[in-house]
Amino acid sequence: INGHIELGVMGCPNLPRDVSQPKPKDGDIRHSSMEGLGVLFVAARGHGAFVAPINDTEAPLEPIHMRELEGDFTRATFCESVEAGHSSLGTNARIAQILGMGDQHVRMDSQAKYASISRGDGDVYLRLPVGDGSYQEKIWDHASGSLLVAEAGGTVSDLAGRPLNFGLGRVLSANKGVVACQSNMHARVIEAVASALKEEGRSSLLSV
């Protein structure tokens, strides 16, 4: 409504309900290997973020929150794309170094990254433009996930810290890249992003 996402629903059929449970290997479709998989995420602006098993219509929605790190980046982990063509993983690594983060990262594709950090599986999600940065993000790739993170205690913005503008059509034409993390860590992540892009001579990505 007026460029703001009011309701977000995401179904992640291959995401373990318990983060400590290993995901089955590709091609393994035995019933036993699929038990415990499938999570439904729901967020409503001003009302919080919730989760339930995707295959249990009677299960109540349980509230979720981002992991509380109290600004300690040494305990934080990245949640980033598997495919290098989707985000600049090398720049991610440099940002992690600037922030003093370790090298333990969670890698997955799709909007499941938003879902993952919203319940504390990871802490920082960056989607940094590759190449000349001409690619424009599609709104459907970020709408539900951005609200989910916001309602779980996080902040989602572009690389320069601007809110994502969903009111300009099919793409986020007023934004470059995505930064999502806990609200009390967001300003520091934005500073690290700017520093890393400056080192690479790509500071132009901070303007649209």
For every predicted segment, state its role.
Residues 14-17, 24-47, 53-208:
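An extended, acidic
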Residues 1-7:
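Glycine-rich active-site/cofactor-binding loop and its immediate structural neighborhood
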